[in-house]
Amino acid sequence: MVQESRPGSVRSYSVGYQARSRSSSQRRHSLTRQRSSQRLIRTISIESDVSNITDDDDLRAVNEGVAGVQLDVSETANKGPRRASATDVTDSLGSTSSEYIEIPFVKETLDASLPSDYLKQDILNLIQSLKISKWYNNKKIQPVAQDMNLVKISGAMTNAIFKVEYPKLPSLLLRIYGPNIDNIIDREYELQILARLSLKNIGPSLYGCFVNGRFEQFLENSKTLTKDDIRNWKNSQRIARRMKELHVGVPLLSSERKNGSACWQKINQWLRTIEKVDQWVGDPKNIENSLLCENWSKFMDIVDRYHKWLISQEQGIEQVNKNLIFCHNDAQYGNLLFTAPVMNTPSLYTAPSSTSLTSQSSSLFPSSSNVIVDDIINPPKQEQSQDSKLVVIDFEYAGANPAAYDLANHLSEWMYDYNNAKAPHQCHADRYPDKEQVLNFLYSYVSHLRGGAKEPIDEEVQRLYKSIIQWRPTVQLFWSLWAILQSGKLEKKEASTAITREEIGPNGKKYIIKTEPESPEEDFVENDDEPEAGVSIDTFDYMAYGRDKIAVFWGDLIGLGIITEEECKNFSSFKFLDTSYL
């Protein structure tokens, strides 16, 4: 607790330290201080699958093939990540890694629950320590915290994300990792993915990292897509083409293909994590309320039954691994941006006109739809040339998966309105795309970058349509388990050891500070300069979100004939989508 001492008023703030962090359990030593942390360089190898932090006198790690951190002694590193030569790094087995990037790093943390003036000063200190270009050592502009503007960006459910603004300086995107993520996101793997994407000029530039977050390029004048934008007939085609480009444009590592689908790796990991919390798993009320099942044992049995069924539909695990590609795995509309206005695109979804001519090509569309398939698979050059204006961001969940999983995830996001002020967690099953909308999306996806494919396009679309329905329950299961972990309900309460002290704030006022551990509910207290609308990591109802997700999971399993209604106790709570194949 912070009490601001000034005549006639006392202001209190909640100030805490993370009881658990990825590096160690430690208290925040103080509030804001004018300090400059040692700037290190994190070297991320593309092929070695490792990235460790080393001391500045341990530079031999690079020569031994460990992607490590070096003391920054070069002025050439001031502009953020740089690409290094192929001969500089070798992996632990002695083979040469082909490429790697170097990213500035400081061993500091940011506490998003700090009062605004403290948080701004800490952010500015980090920017200076990381030597972010234009902000650091600028002879014309010397940034001061009180002139900085923080805008919290809505729609983020894993992190606290801010736009950092300053007059006449390029804005930055600040990402502060959320609580309860230790078992959710592998940050080392995420950085390796960002390195791979950077080498292919995909995604925003990464300017620097700290212990619990990072700074990225802010895409100025960009517009985040909305729930209505993704339903737009032409936008949906464009999203499909861009997803296809990502799927074929980023090769998998051999280790990724060997490890199998990333979604089931995570699902199995999260099931083990939840199962270890005996008190939670052992209470049937938790399982019934959160997973809509009688008990944990029955839930695990049905998940195993579905997984075995899914693998059999794919002709075995070897075939599943063979078909893996690089996937984003979280292509919800909040992660899709237009970097510039797209010409001649309606703002809302409009079905094809009934006066349209019938396509001369074969088609899986109902004859009554009057859709011209040729217009989908052969878009005008002017239309396709604007695809580059659509970019996908936030690769936290990216990894190897079947295309059907990634596409099913995107189509499932049509059911959500994260900017709904009352219930951003709610799943609206009636908003799942209908057959025409799915076919519009799939014809665009399959026809783009098709190369010399021998399979007739209708057959490929039909096969993918079926596979999406079969992988759709995996999507719902994944995010349901994610929600349970993200909610913090499994976290054990730790004893509070409060520390009280006095400090002088950046504005010269005297503060009495009581520092104590944070509970999940206390993390990331709102303190930005501008009001926030829509979903927020602070207020999002993760458990209700997960319950709606698992309701779709059960509905799909019944529709696919994997389980029966008689096996289910909470049948009335289930949500049902169309599970019929073409």
From Swiss-Prot:
pH influence on activity: Optimum pH is 9.5-12.
Record-level GO BP terms: phosphatidylcholine biosynthetic process; phosphatidylethanolamine biosynthetic process
Catalysed reactions listed for this entry: choline + ATP = phosphocholine + ADP + H(+); ethanolamine + ATP = phosphoethanolamine + ADP + H(+)
Record keywords: ATP-binding, Cytoplasm, Kinase, Lipid biosynthesis, Lipid metabolism, Nucleotide-binding, Phospholipid biosynthesis, Phospholipid metabolism, Phosphoprotein, Transferase
Claim: Cell wall biogenesis/degradation is one of the keywords in the record: no
Effect on the protein upon substituting residue 30 to A: Decrease in activity and in phosphorylation by PKA. No phosphorylation by PKA, and strong decrease in activity
Lipid metabolism listed as a keyword: yes
Modified residues (Phosphoserine): 30, 48, 51, 85
Temperature dependence: Optimum temperature is 30 degrees Celsius.
Enzyme Commission number(s): 2.7.1.32
Transmembrane segment boundaries: none
Subcellular location: Cytoplasm
GO molecular function: ATP binding; choline kinase activity; ethanolamine kinase activity
PANTHER family, A to Z: CHOLINE/ETHANOALAMINE KINASE (PTHR22603), RE24176P (PTHR22603:SF93)
Subunit description: Monomer. Interacts with NAP1.
Note, other: Present with 3930 molecules/cell in log phase SD medium.
Protein name: Choline kinase
Organism expressing this protein natively: Saccharomyces cerevisiae (strain ATCC 204508 / S288c) (Baker's yeast)
Gene: CKI1
